[in-house]
């Protein structure tokens, strides 16, 4: 009788532990899915902000070009830099196409780190270039 009781209790403990492990695995996979969804949302918001900023810069550059008509060599250089910045921003809108060759063998975490590094590497100079270009144009207006 004691042996049957010990076997039954052992079986109950084992099945309870197995259910616990299974629930832990499910909660971890659900947490991973939620983290991935939140990262997509954050990148989507960032992409929308970049698109809006890009459209504003294009409109501003076009407005300045129409307003001032002829450009000096310095203005021409600034506009060329702004156009290069716009191309860089376009590549950020479609990171899968732009960095597809670079990221073929990497895992997801390395891809996310690479994308973040590219954003930082491009956005820093872009913001300083845009700031200096706008500052120069505002000085000429004023």
UniProtKB/Swiss-Prot annotation:
Residue positions where Isoleucine amide is found in the record: 141
Tissue expression profile of the protein: Expressed by the skin glands.
InterPro entries, alphabetized: Bombinin (IPR007962)
Main location as per UniProt: secreted
Modified residues (Phenylalanine amide): 68
Protein location: Secreted
GO BP terms in the entry: defense response to bacterium; defense response to fungus; killing of cells of another organism
Positions of the propeptide segment: 19-43, 72-121
Gene Ontology cellular-component terms listed: extracellular region
Record key words, sorted: Amidation, Amphibian defense peptide, Antibiotic, Antimicrobial, Cleavage on pair of basic residues, Cytolysis, Fungicide, Hemolysis, Secreted, Signal
Signal peptide positions (record): 1-18
Pfam families per UniProt: Bombinin
Function of the molecule: Maximin-y shows antimicrobial activity against bacteria and against the fungus C.albicans. It has little hemolytic activity. Maximin-Hv shows antimicrobial activity against bacteria and against the fungus C.albicans. Shows strong hemolytic activity.
Entry similarity comment: Belongs to the bombinin family.
Protein name (database record): Maximins y/Hv type 2
Organism: Bombina maxima
């Amino acid at each position: 009788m004691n042996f049957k009781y010990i076997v039954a209790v052992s079986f109950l403990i084992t099945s309870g532990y197995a259910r616990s492990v299974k629930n832990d695995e499910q909660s971890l996979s659900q947490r991973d899915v939620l983290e991935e969804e939140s990262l997509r949302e954050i990148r989507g918001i960032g992409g929308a902000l970049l698109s809006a900023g890009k459209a504003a810069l294009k409109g501003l550059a076009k407005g300045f070009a129409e307003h001032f008509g002829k450009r000096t060599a310095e203005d021409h250089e600034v506009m060329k830099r702004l156009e290069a910045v716009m191309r860089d921003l376009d590549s950020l809108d479609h990171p899968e196409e732009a960095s597809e060759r670079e990221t073929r063998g990497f895992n997801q975490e390395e891809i996310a780190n690479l994308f973040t590094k590219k954003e930082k590497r491009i956005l820093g100079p872009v913001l300083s270039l845009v700031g200096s270009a706008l500052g120069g144009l505002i000085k000429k207006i004023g």
